[in-house]
Amino acid sequence: MEVIYEDNHLIAVDKTCREIVQGDKTGDTPLSELLKGWLKEKYQKPGNVFVGVTHRLDRPVSGVVLFAKTSKALSRLNEMFRLGQVKKTYWAIVKEKPAKQEDELVNWLVRNEKQNKSYAYDTERPNAKKAVLHYKVIARSDRYYLLEVDLK
């Protein structure tokens, strides 16, 4: 686990792919629990350590995850996310050239709880959640394209 920023209120951690942020049905140890142990050891804290999850990244995704170190910080960060005052930007590396240099994609997501997966469809489905994203190609190599992705 790599901590990339820390102050009295929050801590930012570089999440690797295959790690989970919060506990799930798999029983794998989540990053939030690993962080509690790290903080407890680093600061020699007796008793419980507070770590508040402000947002998540899916298991196959790597990136920076922000955690709150106090309940007050968690409340404030949650409010900032709710009001859209925090901007999350994703970068994706893809092999196939996107159809357009920049575009907006609209899909409908259906969650399969038994498989612990979500599926994307081009057309509306019952019980589906509408998902909109905007992407822009920002770099390319001989074989890959780097996209900047913003979820709407």
Question: Which functions belong to the PLM regions below?
Answer:
Residues M1-K152:
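RNA pseudouridine synthases
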